[in-house]
């Protein structure tokens, strides 16, 4: 019975194709390729790769982009950037990369010093997986398909958890935290969070709608705000919305370096080690089967070493990934309420109970080491008595 149905269906489909062919339609034998040069609308210009390789005279891009193109080539992304698609790119030119190599958090002095993980972070963090004009960055589409303008301040990048796997050695593990003790001898492979990293942007419309003034911007980014400007993290867009066959190219005045989530920044900062020690009390490694599988599938395809187990560096909290509490330890033991932070400082995509992923961010006011030491070691401050009562060693 089923074979007869299949045969009848096959004859019906052949009949439909024949009818369409007679009528002048050729859908069943369509060889139309959007990537063929003759099929591309002239107003779309070049592909993103071609535009960066040889900027059009009509475009506002300036300088050369050999280093950025090298990232594309090394990561096997040339075909994607050369074909039709939907990407938004925020690229820095070679002069900006020269400045980056003079001073960066990885101490990379040249392109050759970049590891594959660093290359992935620099490249994938500078890309959005859809085509968005800069004036549309702060717009958010609601469930009823209407658009609310001027509220978004971040977008999900092309980066994945497997792009940022770190092997953490004993000297870098949280101190006085038994959850990490099994990994002191050989270290541990971790991702800081397995949700997609976000790109933070500041547009004039979003700043006006949310009461962010120039002084606020300077405090957040460390540079003055230029009226009408659009910034990606702290990098100003100096050439915008260059239309290409597969999306838009924007040029930034500096290399976009992912700052990491709040927990990472506190951990990596040179003058917040005491606050980081306090924060470390609330973290633990959680085995991540999906990230381990994803990484090893890719490693197998590309002939690279596989990793036995990859963990997430997570924080006990009332609000964590997926807006769900993380209130059990890695062994699924329930945690006391006083072991839960208000929210997870390592959650890349944090949003509050009344916000959205695109329009909301967390904030932490973190004292530097000097302030912490003064609070606990100065007899005139309240922390001095606390330390006297609970410190294991005398003051």
Language model features: what each stretch is:
Residues 28-395:
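Mature, structured domains of secreted/extracytosolic soluble proteins
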Residues 2-16:
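Bacterial N-terminal signal peptides that target proteins for export
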Residues 23-27:
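C-terminal motif of bacterial Sec signal peptides marking the signal peptidase cleavage site
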């Amino acid at each position: 019975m089923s074979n007869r149905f299949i045969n009848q269906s096959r004859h019906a489909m052949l009949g439909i194709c024949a009818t369409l062919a007679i009528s002048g339609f050729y859908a069943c034998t369509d060889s139309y390729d959007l990537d063929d040069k003759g099929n591309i609308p002239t107003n779309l210009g070049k592909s993103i790769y071609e535009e960066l390789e040889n900027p059009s005279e009509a475009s506002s891009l300036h300088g050369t982009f050999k280093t950025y193109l090298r990232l594309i080539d090394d990561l096997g992304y040339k075909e994607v950037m050369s074909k039709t698609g939907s990407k938004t790119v925020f690229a820095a030119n070679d002069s900006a990369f020269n400045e980056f190599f003079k001073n960066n958090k990885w101490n990379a002095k040249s392109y050759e010093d970049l590891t594959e993980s660093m290359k992935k972070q620099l490249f994938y963090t500078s890309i959005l997986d859809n085509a968005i004009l800069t004036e549309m960055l702060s717009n958010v589409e609601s469930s009823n398909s209407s658009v609310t303008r001027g509220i978004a301040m971040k977008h999900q990048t092309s980066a994945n958890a497997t792009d940022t796997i770190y092997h953490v050695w004993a000297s870098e593990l949280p101190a006085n935290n038994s959850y990490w003790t099994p990994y002191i001898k050989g270290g541990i492979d971790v991702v800081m969070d397995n949700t997609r990293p976000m790109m933070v942007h500041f547009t004039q419309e979003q700043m006006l709608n949310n009461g962010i003034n120039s002084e606020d911007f300077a405090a957040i980014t460390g540079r003055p705000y230029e009226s009408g400007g659009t910034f990606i993290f702290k990098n100003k867009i100096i050439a915008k919305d260059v239309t290409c066959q597969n999306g838009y190219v924007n040029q930034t005045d500096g290399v976009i370096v992912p700052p990491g989530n709040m927990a990472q920044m506190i951990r990596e900062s040179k003058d917040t080690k005491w606050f980081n020690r306090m924060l470390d009390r609330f973290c633990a490694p959680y085995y991540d089967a999906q990230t381990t599988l994803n990484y090893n599938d890719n490693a197998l395809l590309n002939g690279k070493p596989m990793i036995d187990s990859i963990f997430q560096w997570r924080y006990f909290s009332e609000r964590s990934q997926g807006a769900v509490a993380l209130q059990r330890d890695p062994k699924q033991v329930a945690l006391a309420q006083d072991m839960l932070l208000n929210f997870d400082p390592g959650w890349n995509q944090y949003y509050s109970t009344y916000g959205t992923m695109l329009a909301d961010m967390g904030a932490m006011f973190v004292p530097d080491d000097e302030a912490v030491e003064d609070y606990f070691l100065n007899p005139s401050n309240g922390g001095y008595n606390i330390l006297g009562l609970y410190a294991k060693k005398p003051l």
